[in-house]
């Protein structure tokens, strides 16, 4: 267990999510692989998933602009075919909060909170909890 893992586990527990992932900008052919995750019971891991090219995802374009993405209904969020394929690949991703983790001027990591199975209304408090967790994670990167 690293210093990162308790932050993800707490976010999973406090917000009662299905999955929390941290994707880091690491050298290599795959952009932003999942390096850490916390999972609810019965939820599949994304640690070895390498079929979704994040460079083509509309959410990442928002993150690069420094914006957090809050989606209560992912299916309705973007018509983009690559985005829709990602939802299925990620186990029926239905709602998410995706928060950039910047170190200096660069996007160093992506913190994602996932809800599987059904849309979910997120609160400002939920989004703020993700922003606070991202700030804590930035200290370890």
Indicate residue ranges for each PLM-predicted region:
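The cytosolic transmitter module of two-component sensor histidine kinases
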Residues: 1-4, 56, 125-126
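Short regulatory alpha-helical segment in sensory/regulatory domains of signaling proteins that mediates
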Residues: 7-26, 36, 87-88
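Short coil/loop residues immediately preceding or within conserved phosphate-binding loops
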Residues: 17, 58, 96, 108
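GAF sensory/regulatory domain recognition
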Residues: 21-56
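Regulatory sensory and allosteric helical modules in signal-transduction proteins
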Residues: 42-88, 94
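A short, aliphatic-rich beta-strand micro-motif
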Residues: 94-102
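Sensory-domain boundary capping and coupling elements
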Residues: 101-115
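Regulatory loop-to-helix N-cap segments in sensory/regulatory domains
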Residues: 115-133, 140-141
């Amino acid at each position: 267990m690293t210093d990162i893992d308790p932050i993800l586990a707490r976010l999973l527990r406090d917000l009662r999510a299905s999955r929390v992932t941290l994707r880091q900008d690491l050298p290599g052919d795959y952009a932003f692989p999942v390096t850490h995750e916390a999972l609810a019971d019965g939820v599949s891991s994304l640690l070895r998933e390498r079929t979704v090219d994040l460079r083509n995802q509309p959410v990442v374009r928002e993150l690069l602009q420094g914006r957090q993405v809050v989606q209560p209904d992912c299916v309705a969020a973007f018509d983009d075919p690559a985005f829709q394929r990602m939802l299925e690949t990620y186990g029926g991703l239905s709602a998410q909060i995706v928060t950039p983790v910047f170190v200096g001027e660069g996007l160093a990591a992506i913190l994602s909170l996932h809800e599987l199975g059904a849309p979910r209304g997120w609160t400002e408090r939920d989004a703020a909890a993700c922003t606070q967790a991202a700030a804590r994670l930035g200290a370890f990167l």
